[in-house]
Amino acid sequence: MALDEQSQQLLEQIKALNLPPANTVTPSEARENYASRPRLPGPELPFVKDMNIILDDVSVPCRLYKPELNKTLQIIVWFHGGGWVIGSVDGSDGTARHLSLGSGFAVLSVDYRLAPETKYPEPFNDCYGVTKWVYENADQLDIDQKRISVGGDSAGGNLAAAVCLKTHDEAVFKLESQLLIYPCLDSNFTRTSYIANDSGYVLTAPVMKWFWEQYTNSPADLNDPYVCPMKYPDFSDLPKTMIIVADHDPLYDEGVEYHNRLLEANVRSSLIEFTGVMHGFFSQVGVLDKSQKAMNDSCNFLIGLV
């Protein structure tokens, strides 16, 4: 199936910006180019606060969103996409606002350190550390300590899945759920969706390979399940999961496979496949009808309707 009309128009608008692929410029230039793209605003909320969370000797900037005050809320800790190289709390502000308002959850968006200046495991440690900090400081945040979820899109989905695995391994606390939006879960570039979507879209196979090279120290890192969650040996006892995938996306196949692996381990997992859309569509609420549908599905999952 070809891109639907709205997605095709969006792709043409992005191409008209004439921005070079991320793998052909420096990481700094890639960030500047990404930041220059128009951002879609999100809804107004009664509480939005920037904060720094101190983890040992590292200060991690975060932004906390609440859809209502004077109430103990559930929370989703959100990790933005961008191949571990680009992206920011500012760039994902609209997404976080829509998630918070639509679900009734607090959202804590994490500005983890970026590669290649900071390679694995530091960005991952930021994400796990912030999630654990939320658990330890739930009363201060007016958050339900037993109802903490994680989520993210693309590389943020990778980080969310990895945080879920480490939380399971450490057994200090349990997560309520994980929301994975076209997550990057493996470094196998021979999957059919990598070949079929090698070029022509926002995320291409060469760009994705470049992202992996920026994040990892050496090919040996790719054997670490916290880098490639698909390589985790046993998915039993993981929290309920929703995975959203796009058919015009190199990462499509691994999202479907991860869902199937979770089902095989008797984990409650929901997979929603969107056709006619490309990687990145989730952040286009107000532009793409299917982005609004994906946001609604995500919020319903968090609420417990899915």
Which residues fall in each region the model found?
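Short beta-strand element of the alpha/beta-hydrolase
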Residues: 73-82
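Short amphipathic alpha-helix adjacent to the substrate-entry channel of hydrolases
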Residues: 90-108
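Alpha/beta hydrolase fold serine-hydrolase catalytic domain that processes acyl esters and thioesters
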Residues: 162-306
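Short beta-strand-to-loop junctions in surface cap/lid or active-site-entrance loops
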Residues: 62-72, 230-235
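A glycine/proline-hinged amphipathic helix-loop "lid/cap" segment
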Residues: 1-65
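Gly/Ser-rich "nucleophile elbow"/oxyanion-hole loop immediately N-terminal to the catalytic nucleophile
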Residues: 135-150, 170
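Alpha/beta-hydrolase active-site loop
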Residues: 118-140
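Gly/Ala-rich beta-loop-alpha elbow adjacent to hydrolase catalytic centers
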Residues: 152, 156, 160
